[in-house]
């Protein structure tokens, strides 16, 4: 099981557009529920911790069978049910501290920006939480060691979209907001995340940095993994890669979204003051 020699490769535009065209031809683009039968079959190969919303992980003997994790063995982490999407009206907005506010359809994103593909690992920030709970009980999904996977993500660079929008002086953070609807503590709100502008713009020898991804392992994103578009932030925990992306906001401060301000932090006692003072988890901690 050898990894590919190059961590990233650019896609031929005809191939890229071919994916979208083929999907539209069979009705997948506007009807994500077409995936439902396949996803139901795939879920039987996962250890399901919750069905609404879906949270599931593969058995480790399945996970290690290939370098590129098949969708059927890729963990699913959701805080809300899969939202319904109509591509005819769907738009991603880019706003905040930008020179030009943008409103882009999926077709405009794939037509106007260079397509790229990167192999990147995704892992849940709560990976192996069940092991921690053996020592001290921790709330949340009691994950084993399976919520981690390695996939080929295809899409466009976030940096290219931000370049078109133009960053204003003082811009330091980029927020991502989903179109899902999380119900928690009597409130309804979208899942969200934010990363630094520096992380958003980076391009290293390991790859092209943060992506707005529309494909996974060479095929359109399945609904459980963010159809029609999501962010992929290599090197960061999965909580910073937002599925079902609908809004990007450039700001001078981190997002105030619950999952940045009040969750996915490392705390000891867990009282409100400690939660408020703790910094959000970003980089994936190496463990064995």
Q: How would you label these PLM feature ranges?
A:
Residues 1-11, 15, 22, 26:
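N-terminal secretory signal peptides
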Residues 19-21, 37-38:
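Short, intrinsically disordered, low-complexity terminal segments
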Residues 37-288:
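Structured, non-membrane catalytic/scaffold regions adjacent to prosthetic-group chemistry
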